Each structure stands twice: as C-alpha cells, then as structure tokens.
C-alpha cells in the first residue's frame, strides 16, 4: 500500500499553532492588550536573540522562548517539563539532519522488524529500495531489522535515513545505517512519527504487525484530517 502524506503537512510544516502566538501578534501588530511585564519579557527575548547573532525564524523562536519561560510558573511537575525538553531537542536535531536533503524526495517504508532475509517480502523490500532510489528518491525507515533493513539494503547507506526508537527490549539499528550520520534515535513515538510523515513524499506499507498498523493508520488519519 502506497499513499502520500497531506499537502498541508508537507508544505505548511504540518504544525498547529495556538491562536495569537507571539509571531502572530507581531505580524498583526496586536500588542495593545499585553501587560507591561510581558512586553518587557519580549523585549529581553529579542535582546537575547540579537546577542546570539540572530538567524532564521526569529519571531517563532521568540515565541518558543516565551512559552518555555512560562513553564516556570505554569508547570510544577518535573516529568512534564522533561517531555517538552526532550521533544524539542529531538525535533530540532532531526530537522537539522534532514535540512541538507530538503531538495530530494523521500519515501518512508513501514514493515515488520521480524521478517527474515529468506522471505519473499524481504527481497521485495530490497528491490523496492533499489528501484525507488533509481527514480530519484531517498528511503526513510525505522532503522531496525527486517523490512526496515531490507529497504536500506536496496537503497544503500548513502540514500537512507534511519529514524530509530529507543526501547529496552529491542536491538539497535541495522548494520546498513548503524554507523551513518543520517541515523537518529527518539525517546518518544509521537516525535518519531512526526518526522516520518513530515519528511515523506510517499509512504509504503509492507506486511507487519501492530507497529506497522499503527504507523499506517496514523498516516491515514493525518491525511483524512488535513494535518
């Protein structure tokens, strides 16, 4: 089964921004209702960005900083803050890793980690990886064994990304991608799924179990809801 992700995810960044974010307020000029303390905070955030040397998407980064500082008063549970901390760190690293390859189309392959190399579907995944690279695509998989390794074998290390998940009972990345710079490991499934969909021009499902079904239905849900 092959289907592309929604255009809204690929072209708009696939993110939902709460109404009246900092960048939206700056664009619309809607600052009249802001308390003086908030305006001072925003001024200091802008100074911090300038001290850092500026860069891309300064208004959006300012909004992230402002919301991060609000965690000091709004969220007492350390574990909750660590979820945000880890997710932000993982997403920033993943976006940086994919950025040099933004001009290359990519296909994500989902399938069983338990498929043995002697199985027909394993060889089919190898053949698919080889053919899709010849068509100008790169291949993204979950970096594990089975179908994921087969897709990487066909595509070759130079044309492969590995989006791994850290689990205590699973083995590490497959040998094709294990030592490559395009391998990344995630703590959370939700950030991992976002990266799969965000950077894919198409998704391919090979036979698999609950994990493959979860990934496939996640993609279908995002398509159906326009996310």
Regions found by a protein language model. Give the residues of each.
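Intrinsic low-complexity, disordered N-terminal segments enriched in polar/charged/small residues
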Residues: 6-9
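Cysteine-centered motifs
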Residues: 15-17
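Low-complexity, intrinsically disordered or signal/transmembrane-proximal segments
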Residues: 20-22
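Glycine-rich beta-alpha loop segments
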Residues: 27-165, 172
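Acidic/glycine-enriched connector segments
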Residues: 125, 146-206
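Glycine-rich anion-binding loop/nest that anchors nucleotide
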Residues: 201-220
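Arginine/glycine-rich "motif VI" loop of SF2 helicases in the C-terminal RecA-like domain
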Residues: 222-227
């Amino acid at each position: 089964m092959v289907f592309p992700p929604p255009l809204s995810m690929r072209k708009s960044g696939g993110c939902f921004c709460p109404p009246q974010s900092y960048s939206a307020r700056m664009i619309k000029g809607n600052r009249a209702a802001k308390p003086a303390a908030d305006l001072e905070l925003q001024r200091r955030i802008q100074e911090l960005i300038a001290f850092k040397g500026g860069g891309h998407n300064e208004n959006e980064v300012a909004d992230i900083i402002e919301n991060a500082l609000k965690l000091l008063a709004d969220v007492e549970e350390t574990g909750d803050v660590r979820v945000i901390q880890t997710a932000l760190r993982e997403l920033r690293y993943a976006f940086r890793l994919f950025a040099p390859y933004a001009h290359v189309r990519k296909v994500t392959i989902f399938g069983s980690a338990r498929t043995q190399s002697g199985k027909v579907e394993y060889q089919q995944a190898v053949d698919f990886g080889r053919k899709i690279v010849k068509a100008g695509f790169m291949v993204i998989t979950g970096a594990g064994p089975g179908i994921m390794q087969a897709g990487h074998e066909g595509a070759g290390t130079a044309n492969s990304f590995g989006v791994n998940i850290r689990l205590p009972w699973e083995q590490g990345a497959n040998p094709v991608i294990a030592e490559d710079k395009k391998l990344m490991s995630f703590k959370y499934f939700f950030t991992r799924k976002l990266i799969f969909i965000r950077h894919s021009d198409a998704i391919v499902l090979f036979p698999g179990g609950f994990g493959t079904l979860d990934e496939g239905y996640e993609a279908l849900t995002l398509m159906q809801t326009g996310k």
